[in-house]
Amino acid sequence: MMTRAIFLDRDGTINVEVGYLNHPDQVELIPRAGDAIRLLNEAGFKTVVVTNQAGIARGLLQEELLPAIHQRLSALLDQEKARIDAYYYCPHHPEAAIEQYRIACQCRKPFPGLIRTAAADMGIDVARSWVIGDKSCDIELAHNVGAGAVMVMTGYGKTELALHEEAQRQPPHHIAADLYAAAQWILRESR
C-alpha cells in the first residue's frame, strides 16, 4: 500500500531562517518543530524535506557541506525523538553564478521534480500527502502535485502570504502559526 507523507520545506519551516544557511553550526530548530515532526512520525506519515538550495548555485554554500547540515538537523530532531525520513534538494538556479548549476530544472520548487522523485523512491501517495512551508513556492508546489498545502507564519511566512494573496494565486488549504500548529491541523483533517 502507498504511504502518506508530509513534504517539509526546511529553512523557515523546521529551522530558523538565517538567509543562506551555509554551515551546520547555523542550524537551530524553530520552537516546537521537533514536537511537530514527532507527532507526524507517530501518526505514520513519512517526513520528507524538499528544499531549494540556491545558495549552492550562487556560490554561497558548498554542496559538499549539505549532508553535514542535514545530519545536524537530524541530530537536533533526534534529541526530540523526531526524525526526517529523507532529504531532497535542488541546487540549481536559472541565474546561477556557478555555470554547472545554471539551468532551468524541474526540481526547483514550485516545479514538481523533488516530490515526484521522492514519491517514486518511497512509494508515496501524493494525493493523500501534504506540503508545509513558509513560501509561496511551497504552496504552488502542493497545488502542482495535487497535495494539500499548509503555509506557516514562521520564516518568511507573513511576507510571502501577502505576496501570494496579492498575486491572486491559489490559496493554501490552511494557514498555521508554526509547524506544530500545522501538524495538529493536518492530523485532525486526516482522520
Language model features: what each stretch is:
Residues A33, I37-L73, A82-A96, A142:
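Substrate-recognition element of Asp-dependent hydrolases with the DxDx(T/V) motif
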Residues H173-D178, A182:
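Short acidic-hydrophobic, aromatic-tinged amphipathic segments that line or gate anion-handling sites
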Residues Q106-I139:
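Conserved Lys-Pro-Asp/Glu-containing loop-to-beta segment of HAD-superfamily phosphomonoesterases
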Residues A127-H174:
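Acidic, Mg2+-coordinating phosphoryl-transfer loop and its flanking beta/alpha structural elements
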Residues L73-D78, A119:
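Conserved hydrophobic residues forming the short capping helix/wall of the S-adenosyl-L-methionine
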Residues M1-V48:
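Active-site neighborhood of HAD-like aspartate-dependent phosphohydrolases
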Residues L60-S74, Q100-L114, E140-G146:
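Short, electropositive alpha-helical surface patch
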Residues I14-I30, I56-L65, Q79-A82, A96-C107:
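Metal-dependent phosphoesterase signature
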